[in-house]
Amino acid sequence: MDTRTIRLAAVGDELLAGHGDPRALGWFGRALARTPIDSVRIESYVLAAPAEGSEAISQRWLEEVGRRFSEETENRLVIAMTSKDLDLDISTARSRLNLANILDAASQLSIKAMVVGPPPGLDAERNARLSDLSAAYGDVASRRQHAFVDMYTPLLNHEQWRRDLAENNGKPGQAGYGLMAWLVLHRGWYQWLGIPQPTES
């Protein structure tokens, strides 16, 4: 029996790329490192661009992931949504539409997607706005039956997360990325990939 091959492309901003992580793994690299490969071959591609909002991601994702995917492999898409739309004054309705367009196109191409919501920062006013945006992304994903990982709610008042941000100029460091990876791994990652969850995770 041939070994399953999954091509896994991830689009997002600098958090996806692990900027500020002393181990240079970020949450995505950590999640992959904890993913068993005895029954599956995973070929991963990080397609990150700094300071991107939903509009930019929706405009570039298909061309970029299309160059990595193959008809001979199982193709998976990770969409690491960002908080940049808050700075660009993009309405929540528009942000929803941008993600919906990505997921609708992915569904038409039989690409299974996982949406990872944006994590909270330290600014209370911004977090209040981000709460609505994160919830909107979750609603769009669930309506289209794609996986969604809520980063906002569990990290909002997490002491270690907030301390890590405070020590790293508002960005996650090693501890913060570890927390993000843990959430991804325990919110459907293995089921989404169709592989058994290791007992030690």
Regions found by a protein language model. Name each.
Residues 7, 75-78, 112:
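Structural motif
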Residues 1-50, 62-72:
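Serine-esterase "nucleophile elbow" of acetyl-processing enzymes
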Residues 120-201:
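Catalytic His-Asp segment of secreted/periplasmic serine-dependent ester chemistry enzymes
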Residues 27, 31, 64, 95-102, ...:
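A general structural detector for well-ordered alpha-helical segments in enzyme core domains, enriched
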Residues 67-74, 109-110, 191-193:
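Glycine-rich phosphate-binding loop signature in dinucleotide/nucleotide-binding domains
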Residues 21-24, 54-96:
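Oxyanion-hole/transition-state-stabilizing segment in secreted/luminal serine hydrolases
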